[in-house]
């Protein structure tokens, strides 16, 4: 399997592996009330299947990609990716992640965020990577800070579609 391995200074070694058909079970594992509390709640099975299809189709790294976060022993720890989005007066990259509870609090999400920033930056397509965690989600905001993002300020984005979410805008220079 193709993968990229990253080791951070004090963060755990992780692998970012390309999204495959087998990762549908990982997507379902992240679709719990606890994991989606700050994202509008769990999705229906139909929505999960649609998301999985979109993740599989996002295969041009310059436009973005979704990746499984894997531990050195192969265990799936979560999901991360980056994709293009319109923002302010142009296009930029956005990132988002979800790490399973058993792997939370160990630096896995921070390592994954740093790794995905390197991947996005290697595309040399956009100058910034943005993250938009809910203002009410201290863990995701802390991950942004630890991964080197700069807090721009509070904003509102539409997520999930049809809902406006109050979030912090974090930006990382690529």
List where the protein language model places each region.
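Acyl-donor (CoA/ACP) binding surface of acyl/acetyltransferases
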Residues: 1-38, 66-174
